[in-house]
C-alpha cells in the first residue's frame, strides 16, 4: 500500500527539490510513497499574503497565524478524504515540540497518511495546534 504524505509549508518548492532526491526520491519513483507539498500562503485572506503576526495574548517575536494554517490543513484533509484516503495523522513540526528521532520516524511510518505542518518564525499560533494536531 502506498503511504500518502502531505506537507504544509511556507517553502514548498524547497521541500519538493529535497524530497525528489536520494532515498525519498527513489521511494516516490517506485510508488512506495505519494507526496504533495502545499503553500500555506495560498490560504491567507490578505492581499500581502502575510502569514505572520504577533502572538495571540502577547509574547515575544512573531508566530504563524492560525487562519491560513487551519484553512490549508482542512483543505488538504478534505482533498484526501475525497480521494478515498483516511484522515491523515496531523503532526505540527515546531522547535518546541518532541524531537524527531529514528524511533518517532518508525512510528510515523506505520500510519497510512500524514499531514506534516512545518513551523517558522517563533512558532505557530497555539489555537490551530489545539484544533488540529494529533501530535
What kind of region is each of these model predictions?
Residues 1-83:
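N-terminal nucleotide/polyanion-binding subdomain common to many enzyme families
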Residues 65-120, 126:
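S-adenosyl-L-methionine/SAH cofactor-binding core of RNA-modifying enzymes
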